A protein has these predicted regions:
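Conserved mid-core segment of classical short-chain dehydrogenase/reductases
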Residues: 34-49, 92-95
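Residue(s) in the substrate-gating loop at a strand-loop-helix junction
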Residues: 83
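A short helix-coil junction within the Rossmann-fold of NAD(P)-dependent oxidoreductases
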Residues: 38, 65-74, 113
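Active-site-adjacent segment of SDR/Rossmann-fold oxidoreductases
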Residues: 88, 109-120
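Active-site helix of classical SDR
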Residues: 63, 99
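The beta1-alpha1 cofactor-binding region of Rossmann-like NAD(H)/NADP(H)-dependent oxidoreductases
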Residues: 5-16, 45
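C-terminal helical subdomain
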Residues: 123, 131, 135-174
Length: 199
């Protein structure tokens, strides 16, 4: 495996890297941007645009660039790093959640589109992972990068299309059919209590 440093919002850079990696059999889309931005009270749309450009459009660009190479090499696999917030939205990271929900939809869509060429497409959903991006989030449980990586490669090896990397993520996914009953009321109560405490 060869890690590649790349701005995935740079179309020319993506094309250049794809041209250098013609023997690829596994693409891991791990680039991400998290701005901790709400929808309405954010000062501008800049954070939302940055998150969508990287987390959705950048991931899409990588998949488009590498899909033909994977096909030429027997199918291979694409891994998209998603999030528990693919499944629900909070206020503090609302626009990030929207970008990850879009990336989840993208992942499910390209899985269908690339099935005929034999490409496995894996979506990895996790809560906070103990990386620099999650450093501002304190007093919350975090997954180790090693645990998420191990689960991801086990899934690729087994041909599984989804990884739910921690108990929180598994619980939220299981509650999706009752999200307005089970997921959002506790979030709303937390926000309401925080507002009362700050007044």
């Amino acid at each position: 495996m060869t890690p590649v440093g790349l701005d995935i919002t740079d179309a020319e850079g993506v094309a250049q890297v794809a041209g250098q990696c013609t023997d690829v059999s596994l693409l891991v889309n791990n680039a991400g941007v998290l701005k901790y931005s709400p929808f309405i009270s954010a000062p501008s749309l800049d954070a939302a645009r940055a998150e969508m450009e990287t987390n959705y459009f950048g991931t899409l660009s990588m998949c488009r660039a590498f899909a033909p190479l994977l096909a030429a090499n027997g199918g291979g696999a694409i891994v998209n790093m998603l999030s528990v917030t693919s499944f629900y939205t909070n206020v503090i990271d609302a626009s990030y959640a929207a970008s990850k929900a879009a990336a989840w939809s993208l992942t499910n869509g390209i899985r269908l589109e690339l099935h005929p060429q034999g490409t496995l497409v894996v979506g990895v959903h996790a809560g906070f992972i103990d990386t620099d991006m999650a450093a501002p989030a304190t007093n919350v449980p975090k997954d180790s990068p090693e645990s998420v990586a191990e689960q991801t490669f086990d899934a690729v090896e087994a041909g599984q299309v989804e990884v739910l990397a921690d108990e929180r993520t598994r619980t939220v996914k299981a509650q999706l059919s009752r999200d307005q009953e089970l997921i959002y009321p506790p979030i709303q109560k937390f926000l309401d209590d925080a507002l009362k405490g700050g007044s």
